[in-house]
From Swiss-Prot:
Residues that make up the propeptide removed upon maturation: 1479-1509
Active site: D472, E498
Cellular localisation: Secreted, Cell wall
Reaction(s) this enzyme catalyzes, per UniProt: a 3-O-[beta-D-galactosyl-(1->3)-N-acetyl-alpha-D-galactosaminyl]-L-threonyl-[protein] + H2O = beta-D-galactosyl-(1->3)-N-acetyl-D-galactosamine + L-threonyl-[protein]; a 3-O-[beta-D-galactosyl-(1->3)-N-acetyl-alpha-D-galactosaminyl]-L-seryl-[protein] + H2O = beta-D-galactosyl-(1->3)-N-acetyl-D-galactosamine + L-seryl-[protein]
Chain intervals for the UniProt region annotation (Disordered): 1176-1197, 1403-1439
GO cellular component: extracellular region
Name of the protein: Putative endo-alpha-N-acetylgalactosaminidase
Organism name: Renibacterium salmoninarum (strain ATCC 33209 / DSM 20767 / JCM 11484 / NBRC 15589 / NCIMB 2235)
Record: residues binding Ca(2+) 1: D288, N290, D292, K294, D299
Protein residues bound to Ca(2+) 2: N878, E880, D926, Y929
Length: 1509
């Protein structure tokens, strides 16, 4: 068929053109689709004499192309095939280029090649094949190109480094990629056979191994892809393989072969003139490397280690037994660098010197997520700056500790020195917490040299014991990732990252892999046996394994609120030490229930609970009990580190405790006895000596307690004197030494170990003190303080030759809410004095308390150089020299015990200031620093205390400060007092918008109810709420004329938003803290004009007892025209009943806003106001960007199916967003799906609800699946909820996009005119008739009513079904009025609007002489002018019976075979079609002619038979 042939030719031509286009357009990258089955050539003959060889290996190579044809092991003469087809082209810039090749054998081991593309003038490549040992290396040593013909990338797709075939026994190709879905292995092991499926295109992997039963081969390459190439992520395109037909095997079955080739090489990135490393690949050949009597992929994996490009710092991994995260955040400096050094020493003593990696999160600027794109040059001064940082590094090395830092090369914050309009893209927002970050232009960063300069600056400034760089939130792959890794590696850093998939070439530690709270089971650790076989000791990124285990991190230094040192230690002993013991050796054989390793190690079992680890045949671990040999030599880290691995001590641990007997390994079995030490906070504690009997020892252990055993007591690991406080001017500032040996303690003061295992000093119940002569201080001002859990306590500093300076406090209601502080949840706060040292010398420090039952605890004494702020009042603060924290303010309860969103902001004009990138306010108001709150959590943001700002009872004060506020009524200035441990708020004043620096001034009187305080509260919930403060001044105005109330008053709204024209509820809560009862209590509201209120419950009380409360519910009527934001105030007034008797009042106010006006045109959901605050599974819901992280505005662009959407909502399951549309919108439209950012991860179910009723529910939407476009009728809903539900076991990665979300509201929706219908002709009704009235387009579940008019007769009420249909079953009464009527139906239409519809109805008298035909007619159109005859004719066939027509005609439907189209009642003619179609409805029948009746009956039968034949 020529036509079909032409169509096929056209289709093929289209495919060819499409492929050509892809090749041309893909010049800057390699597409996976381009590796189709290559053209096959005849098998290559071995070129005589063209072979190269080492002492171990002979390789036959092609003279016509740099391909190995075969490998022969010299000692065994065993053989492995190389290429079986001749390559004749190289893919350059995505296009296959035919080439000419010449070759020359340079020496016995080397052949050189010159490769010249036929069609690229001026381009040539020098290449080489060289064999050394058991390894063949292919490399391109030179690329020559021209400006017109640049070589950007290249690939030899069918170089076929090794080929195995199903014709060879044991033919296998094992490959691996990094899979972080715990349920999905990253391994593919292909055992080639005649049934192996052929591959239409190549498959790719990060690692590949080929084997037969003779030899195995491992491969390495520097394959690299440009960033943005889909093959690049997780280095999954390093190796290509493809199952192809290989003729017919000896058994007559089809044979299948598979070859392994390198992936593509990148020479120049798109837009770059810089060239990358020249391409190379390697093949290493191996026999039975693990001596298990067979050759398989595991032998190739062992051999691969000899050519592997190992991760930088990989050799350090096995000695990083203890990983911990000292955390500094938001200017709090809770872990100064010298404090961390002491913690490192403390851990070393508790673990007898196990190797540590201390990862500093917050070493820059104001701490974590502050200017962390500044790798160097911006060290956290409040934590000690560069000097103390390097002291920490150098001091930690003697205790087996090395350090890492948390850097960010994805996002930058405006405060960073590196920040600029060129450095970032100001339109792309990133993480948003303390500040809004912006995504770095990484290509420019690389090409400008900025990235490497920042790396080099860190390397040059920090000491050599900084060995690791943890790269946060790094998503890039390919070239950008390679250049960052290379820069860090060249600078001597090992690489770690948040994700196990990031930077896989060098990633040695993944946070999500070690801390299982992150990521969910489908995005957490690397699940691949092959990669772990190779690199088990080089990385900590692995899935849990029942034999090998996996490393974990359990924190205690404030990261993610963790503060349990006991749990930290338990993780070391119960999990990490056995993992690291196995990592000391390399895996050699891995079976389902056993793993063999070098060093004589073997693991057997089925789970961690029953596994046994043996060394040299001796069990050293049984389940959760062990006696592990270890080296006592201090460990060192970094490039060139050499560690003594001699096993000369033993670690003993039993999870449950008890007595156990252990056979000793040969190193210890000959000893006569072993010294056993219990490990404590202070190091080794000698328990005694245990005899060695027949090479065994019997030990008794406490549960979860670690011990060390040595044959020689002189074998130690940790220095005897830890010298706590070195460099800090305070000896043992954290009370880590036993017995307060560096302090003068009196009155029973001692060290206490808290329930979390933290060490503090505790003063005795009698008069008690601790004191110390500090280190010598140079002249100047100093802040000297300590963390104190306060009851009456005095901190005194006496300078040498000077007068004592002290501060005394007796109580505090200020709970510690700082999540980064181990003391969170307690009432520890920092107590300090500012001291001027006139003459150099050593001051005396004393912390004392009088006798009392309440405990006083002390920790972290610190001396910091400071500058006093001059004041004209009792206190001034300009935040220019704050030593740590936000003094005089401390964090309040906003967000609870969490990381605050307030910090001391640093000027970096113009980026931190008003006007840049749409900023409406400045972060910094004066000089260099201001206190800045960024979109803070609701609650008390910060407050003073009686020791940061002492306010005396009975005096009046003025508090003033400079401020800017981006929005009105988002923050309030509050004051109150502490009643015991409970802060009581007594006054609140909303802060108006101020986009220029404005002076705030307010007076308050301090009462006798408790210590007075002032502070900032976040009351609003709007995004973009900024508040900056500077130049705080507190002045004493003298005695107060008023006595403040000892009471609190709060006011809350009972609804998210105020509904206009409706009654809204408010609740006022009054609580008295007066010492005695009060009288005449009255609570009143102060409302905006036009608003009215009535108390639904009592608002007055004649008396109220001490500590009593009054709750008043208010009904507030809001005018229909109210619109916008309002402030509702409340005031409580009462009289005291004991001295001082008088009137008291407490006030408060709350900000509310009214329902937005419903849209009147099509409106994007992201441009509309939410009702309340949406709930969301991760961070906040985002507008016009995807979900992002924990802060507003930190998501990437919305992207579904490769399409970027500028408008929409970014949510995360489980999520709920409410809108008010006021029945004015007909439909909601959106494109829904899981954002492309999550790739194949995440799943969720979307739904739309109107007024609480389900309108739409999606199927399960999964990452990587196609998005869906939805249009949902709203059926008149007033409120619309957009919900996303969790699908599956967890909601990890469920970034749920409502892209292009829009409400269709182009015009006000008019009520639908209902169209009721009857089940019978409308003029056929008679008294007593039964019929159905049906009406549709109603709102599902609504009630409709029917009436007969004009004399209304109720026909009933019916509820519409799910399809919006109501059916009324009606039977007319016998006395129903005759004549013309209307049936009127009223109800609610599908849009929720009141609707009406009518249908005419005629009720006639019953026919006194009805026809008797057996099949009465049902014609739907009996004519419009009926005759007057009294009866119709009879029909015995299929004819019809006229119901009152003139006797000159019959109207009918012709029985069951067709409907009459109606007839003219006067002429009897029928205007319809054929006889069969009209059913004789127009046939004239003269009266009295019976024959005709018979003919009609017969004809009806005939026609009926014809219709159904």
């Amino acid at each position: 068929m020529p036509f079909r042939g032409r169509r096929r030719q056209s289709a093929l031509r289209g495919l060819s053109l499409a492929a050509t286009f892809c090749l041309a357009a893909g010049s800057s990258g390699i597409s996976g689709a381009l590796f189709a089955t290559p053209a096959q050539a005849d098998p290559l003959p071995t070129a005589a004499g063209l072979s190269i060889n080492s002492a171990n290996l002979t390789v036959e190579v092609s003279a016509d192309f740099p391909q190995a044809l075969s490998y022969t092991e010299t000692s065994s003469a065993k053989h492995l095939s190389g290429a079986r087809t001749l390559a004749s082209s190289i893919t350059i810039n995505g296009t296959d280029q035919p080439v000419k090749v010449s070759s020359q054998k340079a020496d016995a081991q080397t052949v050189n090649y010159l490769i010249t593309p036929n069609n690229l003038a001026g381009v040539s490549l020098d290449a080489q094949l060289r064999v050394e040992g058991m390894t063949l290396t292919f490399k391109i040593s030179k690329i020559k190109d021209t400006a017109e013909n640049r070589v950007n990338n290249l690939q030899i797709k069918n170089q076929d480094l090794v080929t195995v075939s199903s014709q060879e026994p044991g033919a296998t190709v094992a490959s691996a990629v990094v899979s972080v879905d715990r349920a999905v292995s990253g391994d593919t092991i292909t055992n080639l056979s005649s049934t192996t499926a052929l591959d239409p295109t190549a498959k790719r992997s990060m690692l590949a191994i080929a084997a037969t039963d003779q030899l195995a081969a491992g491969f390495e390459t520097n394959s690299l892809y440009d960033s943005g190439n889909t093959i690049g992520p997780s280095d999954q395109g390093k190796f290509w393989r493809q199952a192809l037909a290989d003729g017919t095997g000896a058994d007559g079955k089809p044979a299948v072969k598979m070859a392994v080739s390198s992936g593509a090489w990148l020479y120049r990135s798109a837009g770059s003139d810089q060239t990358e490393e020249l391409p190379w690949s390697k093949v290493v050949i191996s026999g039975d490397a693990n001596a298990d009597g067979k050759v398989d992929w595991q032998d190739g994996a062992i051999a691969y280690r000899s050519i592997e490009s190992k991760p930088a710092g990989g050799d350090d991994v096995k000695n990083r037994v203890v990983t911990h995260i000292p955390f500094n955040f938001a200017s709090q400096a809770t872990h100064p660098f010298l404090r961390t050094l002491d913690d490192v020493k403390h851990i070393a003593l508790a673990t007898d010197g196990l190797g540590q990696m201390a990862l500093e999160k917050g070493y820059t600027s104001e701490g974590h997520d502050s200017a962390n794109s500044d790798f160097g040059g911006n060290f956290n001064e409040r934590a000690g700056g560069l000097t103390d940082f390097n002291a920490m590094l150098s001091g930690g090395s003697a205790y087996g500790a090395t350090f890492g830092v948390h850097i960010n090369n994805t996002e930058a914050y405006p405060e960073a020195n590196s920040f600029s309009n060129d450095f970032v893209d100001p339109t792309k927002k990133g993480w948003n917490w303390l500040d809004q970050s912006f995504y770095i232009d990484q290509q420019r960063d690389i090409l400008s040299g900025s990235q490497q300069q920042r790396i080099d600056q860190l390397r040059s400034e920090a000491g050599p014991n900084l060995t690791m760089a943890y790269v946060d939130v790094y998503y890039e792959s390919g070239w950008k990732s390679y250049r960052l890794q290379k820069g860090l590696k060249d600078a001597g850093f090992s690489v770690a990252s948040e994700f196990a998939t990031a930077m896989p070439a060098n990633n040695t530690w993944s946070h999500w892999a070690n801390d299982e709270k992150h990521g969910g089971s489908n995005n957490i650790k690397a699940g691949t046996q092959i990669l772990r076989f190779v690199d088990n000791s080089q990385r900590d990124i692995w899935n849990p394994d029942p034999l090998l285990g996996t490393s974990h991190i359990v924190e205690w230094e404030g990261w993610t609120n963790q503060n349990d040192y006991n749990a930290f230690l338990k993780n070391i002993w119960g999990n990490n030490l056995p993992v690291k013991f196995l990592q000391q050796q390399q895996i050699t054989s891995w079976k389902s229930r056993s793993v063999d390793l070098t060093g004589g190690l073997k693991v057997t079992g089925t789970s961690l609970a029953d596994r046994v680890i043996s060394q040299q045949g001796v069990p050293v671990l049984k389940g959760s009990n062990y006696l592990l040999p270890w080296s006592a030599a201090p460990v060192s880290f970094g490039s060139g580190a050499v560690n003594d691995t001699t096993q000369n001590k033993l670690y003993h641990y039993s999870a449950d405790g008890g007595t156990s007997t252990w056979q000793l390994t040969p190193q210890f079995a000959t000893a006569s006895s072993l010294q056993i030490y219990k490990l404590t906070d202070y190091g080794r504690e000698l328990i005694g000596s245990v005899p060695v009997v027949n090479g065994s020892v019997t030990l008794t252990a406490e549960a979860n307690q670690a011990y060390v055993l040595v044959a020689d007591a002189s074998v130690t690991t940790v220095p005897a004197d830890p010298s706590y406080g070195a460099g800090s001017k305070v000896k043992d500032p954290g009370f880590n030494s036993a017995g307060l040996k560096d302090w003068n303690a009196t009155g029973g003061a001692a060290v206490e170990r808290t329930a979390q295992g933290l060490l503090v000093a505790k003063l005795g119940q009698g008069s008690s003190a601790i004191s110390q002569t500090l280190g010598s201080l140079d002249p100047g001002s100093y802040s000297i303080g300590a963390w104190v859990e306060i009851e009456p306590t005095t901190l005194t500093v006496t300078p040498a030759g000077g007068a004592p300076i002290s501060v005394t406090v007796d109580q505090s209601g200020a709970e510690n809410f700082v999540a980064s502080d181990e003391k969170r949840g307690t009432y520890f706060q920092r107590l300090r004095v500012l001291v001027d040292i006139a003459n150099a010398g050593a001051p005396q420090l004393s912390i004392s308390a009088p006798a009392g039952e309440a405990a006083v605890r002390i920790d972290d004494v610190r001396v910091v150089k400071a500058n006093k702020v001059p004041t004209t009042g009792i206190l001034s603060e300009n935040f220019e020299n704050t030593d740590q924290g936000w003094l005089p303010f401390i964090k309040g309860d906003a967000g609870g015990q969490t990381d605050p969103r307030t910090h001391i902001a640093k000027l970096n004009a113009p980026y931190t200031q008003k006007g840049w990138n749409g900023k409406t306010t400045s972060d910094v108001l004066d000089d260099t620093y201001s206190l800045h709150s960024h979109e803070e959590n609701q609650g008390l943001v910060y407050r003073t205390s009686n020791y940061t700002l002492p306010l005396q009872a009975g005096r009046q004060y003025r508090v003033s400060f400079d401020y800017q506020a981006s929005l009105a009524n988002q923050y309030t200035w509050v004051s109150g007092y502490d009643s015991g441990k409970n802060p009581v708020q007594t006054a609140s004043t909303a802060i108006p918008v101020a986009t220029d620096t404005t002076r705030w001034s307010q007076t308050l009187s301090a009462g006798s109810c408790g210590p007075a305080w002032v502070g900032l509260q976040r009351t609003g919930s709007s995004g973009g709420a900024e508040f900056s403060m500077d130049n705080l001044l507190v002045e004493d105005l003298g005695p107060s004329a008023e006595t403040p109330a000892c009471a609190s008053l709060s006011l809350t709204s009972g609804q998210d938003v105020i509904e206009q024209g409706q009654t809204n509820t408010f609740s006022a809560s009054f609580s008295s803290s007066e010492a005695q009862s009060i009288a005449g209590l009255s609570v009143a509201l102060d409302l905006p004009a036009g608003w009215t209120a009535s108390a639904a419950t009592p608002a007055t009380a004649a008396t109220l007892p001490a500590g009593g409360s009054l709750e008043t519910q208010w009904k507030v009527q809001v005018p229909a025209d109210a619109d916008g934001d309002y402030t509702i105030k409340a005031k409580a007034s009462y009289q005291t009943t004991v001295d001082p008797i008088g009137s008291r009042s407490a006030t408060t106010e709350t900000a509310v806003y009214t329902l937005p006006k419903p849209p009147t045109k099509d409106t994007y959901a992201s441009d509309m106001q939410w009702i309340g605050t949406p709930s969301n599974g991760w961070g906040p819901v985002e507008k016009d960007q995807a979900n992002g992280e924990q802060a507003q505005g930190d998501g990437p662009p919305l992207k579904l199916g490769g399409v970027t959407y500028p408008k929409g909502l970014g949510a995360h399951a489980a999520s709920s967003i409410r809108y008010y549309v006021g029945s004015q919108c007909s439909a909601f439209t959106a494109v829904i799906g899981i954002d492309d950012f999550q790739k194949l991860k995440g799943q969720a179910v979307f739904s739309v609800l109107g007024d609480g009723n389900s309108l739409y529910t999606s199927p399960v939407m999964k990452g990587g699946a196609a998005a869906q476009t939805i249009t949902v009728p709203l059926n008149g809903a007033k409120y619309v909820d957009l919900k996303v539900a969790i699908s599956g076991a967890n909601n990890g990665n469920a970034w749920s996009d409502w892209a292009n979300a829009k409400f269709l509201c182009s015009a006000p929706v008019a009520p639908i005119t209902l169209q009721p219908t009857l089940s019978v002709p409308t003029d056929s009704l008679q008294p007593g008739s039964a019929f159905t009235v049906r009406v549709d387009q109603l709102k599902s579940g609504s009630t409709a009513k029917a009436e007969l008019h004009s004399d209304p007769i109720d026909l009933g009420s019916v509820q519409a079904n799910n399809d919006g249909v109501a059916s009324f079953q009606v039977t007319l009464a016998q006395d129903a009025p005759l004549g013309n009527h209307q049936i009127v139906v009223t109800g609610t239409d599908k849009n929720g609007l009141a609707a009406t519809g009518t249908v005419d109805a005629q009720i006639k008298a019953a026919n006194p002489n009805p026809g008797t035909g057996s099949n009465p007619g049902t014609g739907s159109n009996p004519g419009t002018d009926p005759g007057t005859g009294s009866a119709g004719g009879n029909s015995s066939g299929g004819g019809a019976n006229g119901s009152g027509a003139n006797g000159t005609y019959v109207n009918g439907s012709g029985g069951s075979f067709g409907n009459g189209a109606g007839m003219d009642a006067k002429t009897g003619s029928n205007s319809a079609s054929s006889l069969a179609e009209t059913g004789f409805s127009g046939l004239v029948l003269p009266l009295g002619i019976g024959l005709m009746l018979l003919l009609i009956g017969a004809a009806a039968i005939i026609v009926r038979r014809h219709r159904h034949s």
